[in-house]
Amino acid sequence: INWKALLDAAKKVL
């Protein structure tokens, strides 16, 4: 799992 990808997804949801 990529941390940056997870952060990007969270930013999109937020």
Swiss-Prot record:
The modification Leucine amide is found at L14. It comes from the Eukaryota. The record marks L14 as: Amidated C-terminal residue positioned outside of zwitterionic and anionic membranes most of the time. Its main location: secreted. The record marks I1 as: Positioned outside of zwitterionic and anionic membranes most of the time. GO terms for molecular function: toxin activity. Keywords: Amidation, Antibiotic, Antimicrobial, G-protein coupled receptor impairing toxin, Immunity, Innate immunity, Mast cell degranulation, Membrane, Secreted, Target cell membrane, Target membrane, Toxin. Belongs to the MCD family. Mastoparan subfamily. Potent antimicrobial peptide and potent mast cell degranulating peptide. Is active on both Gram-negative bacteria (E.coli MIC=7.8 ug/ml, and P.aeruginosa MIC=62.5 ug/ml) and Gram-positive bacteria (S.aureus MIC=15.6 ug/ml, and B.cereus MIC=7.8 ug/ml). Its mast cell degranulation activity may be related to the activation of G-protein coupled receptors in mast cells as well as interaction with other proteins located in cell endosomal membranes in the mast cells. Shows a reduced level of hemolytic activity on rat erythrocytes. This is Protonectarina mastoparan. The lineage of its organism: Eukaryota, Metazoa, Ecdysozoa, Arthropoda, Hexapoda.
